[in-house]
Amino acid sequence: MARIELLPRVYGSYKANLHCHTTYSDGNLSPEQVKEHYKANGYSVVAFTDHNVLIDHSALNDKDFLALVGLEVDTDSFLYGKKHEFNQTCHLCAILRDPARAVPVYRAEQYTGKAISAKIDEFHQNGYIVNYNHPTWSCEGADEFLHYGRFDGMELFNYSAEVANNNGYSHGEYALALRLMNHRIRCIAADDNHNGYDCEDDSCGGWVVFKAPELSYETIIKAYDDMCFYSSTGPEIKQCYIEDGVFVLDCSPV
């Protein structure tokens, strides 16, 4: 039986943070400081996803660093007419597939499955990838996200939520989504960094490693689409393949 490479070894590895905040919203580092900090820690890619504002930081790009253009939109139950004991909220990271095609899309203004699903559709129609963020932190469960339509990825791990509130893991929610939503959902680990105390406060704790032939906007988006990446909070995956019906994973110590 032919060997099936799940992470092509001939490709380069590009470490990425797909959820990041700067001084353009509620973060404490400038985009330039974010780039400096993440490059120093071995990252090649950062998606700049400030709250409800789309800003192109491609001026930060160099041969070893790529800024993805995106934003995080949030719809709170408290603000939009649905009262709960806890303030439920839906946060979505939307990342442009083509930074030259930047069409602003704003958050849903009703906290309903129908409104949020329509907003995800609008993002897709305007050339965005959509990741559903930190459901555990958001106090959301299957009753909510099963009505959100076809988001592309879900944060299985959010480092900022884990550091601040011990609720950054969303294993159960991800398992339910895979079983019940009838489409492939990418598994994302991300920082959601705000750097409120120092650079290390909520940075470099959860990441994605893309496998791509080179570092460019197009190749990283293609790697996302093709699921040619893995998410981690520590171990490095060196090989991942299926051979003779056996799944083989070679990684650094866990």
Which sequence ranges carry the predicted segments?
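Sec-exported extracytoplasmic/periplasmic mature domains
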Residues: K39-S44, L180-H183, D225
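Functionally critical loop-and-helix segments that line ligand-binding/catalytic clefts
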Residues: G172-R179, S216
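A metal-dependent hydrolase metal-coordination microenvironment
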Residues: A2-I129, N133, E140-A142, H147-G149, ...
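Active-site-proximal helix/loop capping residues that flank conserved catalytic or ligand/cofactor
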Residues: Y128, D152, K222-D225
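C-terminal functional module detector
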Residues: M1-R9, S13, N182-R186, N193-V254
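Short, well-ordered alpha-helical segments in soluble proteins
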Residues: E155-A161, R179-N182, C228
